[in-house]
């Protein structure tokens, strides 16, 4: 089924705890978490958090977790099927320790990027046939979405989906 999809940036401080502070310091950025949301009935979000496979949760549960959405980027309509849900459930687990090690030392020694919320978004869109860059930090994603030449964030049908602030 075709559903509208968005990349959403959230303040995940209540869930990230000490990882929130370290990621902010190591990336010199206020952006620490992003995930995909789909306008299904009811709306769902696919999030990746420390030590767990990707989780599919309802939008209502996000509000109960006391996390705050501060920006969304509409990426248009995507076909959502059983293959997508299998992809979500089989995506590699995120490890905060690996992410922090990568930020502090690993990137200087050619370490493979650890899985995180942004690599999940990029990998999923590549799975859907998009030509998107390999990004790692929420700051890189934010800058790429807001670049003057953000043509890479067009769907395979080449629609340019513009960003908008969450009301």
Where are these regions (language model features)?
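Acidic/proline-rich low-complexity IDRs
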Residues: 43, 77-79, 140, 144
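Activation targets extended, charge/polar-rich intrinsically disordered C-terminal tails
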Residues: 94, 99-167
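Glycine-rich catalytic cores of cysteine/serine-nucleophile enzymes that process amide/ester linkages
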Residues: 3-76, 104-112
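Intrinsic-disorder/low-complexity regions
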Residues: 3, 38, 49, 73-78, ...
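A structural motif
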Residues: 76-101
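Amphipathic alpha-helical interface surfaces
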Residues: 57-61, 81-84, 117
